[in-house]
């Protein structure tokens, strides 16, 4: 069942979110969730240590616990949008990194404000079970030392973990399996 709310109610919710859920500060730990296949294609098998984390929707790490399964992740973060690569039958990847940018915004203050459902335009996910503040980064940011990537199977178990470290000899930033 889809419930529609009035424009004034959305504005009230946006003001509430702006006041009580401030944008991530520089150096605050944020999370980006990506499909496992994207991690393999763009990160794990890439030889370019300067590969970007990309832009898009992110959350503060402190705002939620990693879900116990792909199914729970999809529901909690509302990753069930049209064309999604996320599936209850596949694993997922969580990238945790220090926010390098002062430009992470509430999504209703960005071009994302016209997205279709399940996007709510309130700054919160639209899950039936929980509400998680969400933000949008339009900056393409690079991986840096101490950024962490964890690969989860469909049951929410960590199967691989990586950290960016600086090579002592070449001084290049490299993935190191933990």
Question: What label would you give each PLM region?
Answer:
Residues 1-8:
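Hydrophobic, membrane-inserting alpha-helical segments
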Residues 10-178:
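Catalytic toxin/effector domains delivered as secreted proteins or via bacterial secretion systems
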């Amino acid at each position: 069942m889809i419930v529609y709310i009035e424009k004034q109610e959305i504005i009230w919710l946006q003001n509430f979110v702006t006041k009580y859920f401030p944008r991530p500060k520089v150096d605050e730990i944020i999370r980006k969730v990506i499909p496992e296949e994207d991690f393999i294609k763009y990160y794990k098998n890439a030889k370019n240590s300067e590969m970007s984390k990309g832009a898009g929707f992110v959350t503060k790490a402190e705002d939620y616990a990693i879900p116990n399964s792909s199914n729970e992740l999809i529901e909690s973060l509302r990753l069930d949008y049209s064309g999604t690569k996320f599936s209850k039958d596949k694993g997922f990847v969580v990238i945790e990194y220090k926010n390098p940018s002062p430009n992470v915004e509430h999504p209703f203050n960005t071009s994302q404000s016209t997205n279709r459902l399940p996007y709510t335009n309130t700054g919160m996910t639209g899950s039936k079970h929980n509400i998680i503040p969400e933000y949008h980064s339009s900056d393409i940011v690079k991986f840096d030392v101490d950024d962490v990537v964890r690969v989860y199977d469909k049951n929410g178990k960590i199967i691989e973990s990586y950290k960016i470290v600086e090579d002592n000899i070449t001084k290049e930033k490299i993935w190191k399996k933990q």
